[in-house]
Amino acid sequence: MRLLAVLISVLWLCCQPAQAQVRNYDEMIAAGELKVAVYKDFAPYSFESAGKPQGVDVELAEALAKALGVRLSLIWAPAGEKLDDDLRDYIWRASALHNQQLADLMMRVPYDHDYAQKRNELGELVNGQVVMFGPYQNEQWQVAYDRRRLDKVASVAVFEQHPIGVEVDSVPSFYLTSVFNGMLAGKTHHYPGVPQAFAAMKAGEVDAVMAMRGEIDWQVHETADPQVALAENAYPNMGKQLWEIGMAVHESNRQLAYAVEEALEGLIREGAVKTIYGHYGLRYDVPEMYQ
């Protein structure tokens, strides 16, 4: 019986998928390939159009790979329930659900000290095997509105009378349904995503849409309607309203982080990153680190 148990254990181990290994910088250079994880179907940052990869993060990843003298290999990452899950699945442990793929670099990760230092109930760093670095974008909340039905947005209080569209389960959703003791909840309409909210505004179901600035800029660019305007209102009682977006590598791969950060700074200072954002109608503010 003991021998049978050992044999079963050996067979079980043999049937498990091979654990993906983190490549170091020298191995990546020798392979001539930079594997970069980008979020799937997340316009304007990473998406496919007519079978061709497009988006800000895709173009920036291409520019970084070129600066390192290697080719780009994209890993399309469906967004998980939490960013912690995405970092685990694509940077340090891999997942059988994603074919055991590990990226050398992951785009669109918050560059935030508090998040990087987040600890679990045992006091351990939740993302201790990850280095977050290289801020390349400032992000914030933005409202776009249709001037045919709304003269201006001096305050979010106008959405007590005017319907506004938001993505379901998003920060704007929670904010608009709770601020001012919930007085805006009745006029807050929920949609599967920002494109659907914009389509609803075009159809006259809502007079405005609230989302991240980059997504709003992209939709305004795609809509190409001069009557769709950008609001300049404040968001009282919202908490953090401006944050930076960067990248992530495995904590053992700091050499890659240094090389990528050096390449990124060059691209920012020469205006290449701003040009990439312009391809998709996005405004670009240089992150504080490079000012």
Label every model-predicted segment:
Residues 109-124, 175-179, 202-203, 207-241:
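A ligand-binding cleft/hinge motif common to bilobed small-molecule-binding domains
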Residues 38, 54-67, 138-183, 189-192, ...:
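Bilobed "Venus flytrap"/periplasmic-binding protein-like clamshell domains
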Residues 74-156:
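Acidic, polar ligand-binding/catalytic clefts
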Residues 25, 58-67, 147-150, 162-163, ...:
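Extended ligand-binding regions for polar small-molecule ligands
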Residues 64, 91, 159, 200-202, ...:
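Hydrophobic residues within well-ordered alpha-helices
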Residues 4-16:
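Bacterial N-terminal signal peptides
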Residues 40, 136-144, 213, 221-261, ...:
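Periplasmic-binding protein-like
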Residues 21-109:
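Extracytoplasmic small-molecule ligand-binding "clamshell" domains
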